Amino acid sequence: MKKDTRYLVSVALMAAIVILLANTPLGMIQLPIIKATTVHIPVIIGAILLGPSAGAILGAIFGICSLISNTTAPTLLSFAFSPFLSTTGLVGVVKAIWISVGCRIMIGVISGWLWILFRKLKANSYLSLIITGFVGSMVNTIFVMGSIYLLFAGQYAAAKDVARTAVFGLIMGTVT
């Protein structure tokens, strides 16, 4: 598909917003265990305005910024977001890249395709925006926290000094 100059500039502007948010306390909110984020918001907006491919690009930029942030200013759970802090070798590197980049790409892809679906169904635009924004935020939360649970439950338990059986409850507590 041919992309015109306006599209490329729009993606670049949204990417600049993602990078700005990812490198300020407005986007990456430092908590004792993990970094909360608002960076997914421009990814969702970009996916709605520019489509799923732009959403994927913006999500990848968000993920790379997250990877860099967790490498340069680590928290207790940064091993789950940075391949350079992996505790389980090459497998841990791949898992960390999935959590930091892959999950964030999915925000843009799913939000973009959901918006396209709503447009094809001729759904109420206002309600569609609310639902797409909510789903995009939940994709971020569920994919990231779910992947941490599925891929790093043992390391999470060790980092928090709790039993592995308590990890699900702790992750759900972080989500809520």
Identify the meaning behind each predicted range.
Residues M1-T176:
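Loop-helix junctions at membrane interfaces
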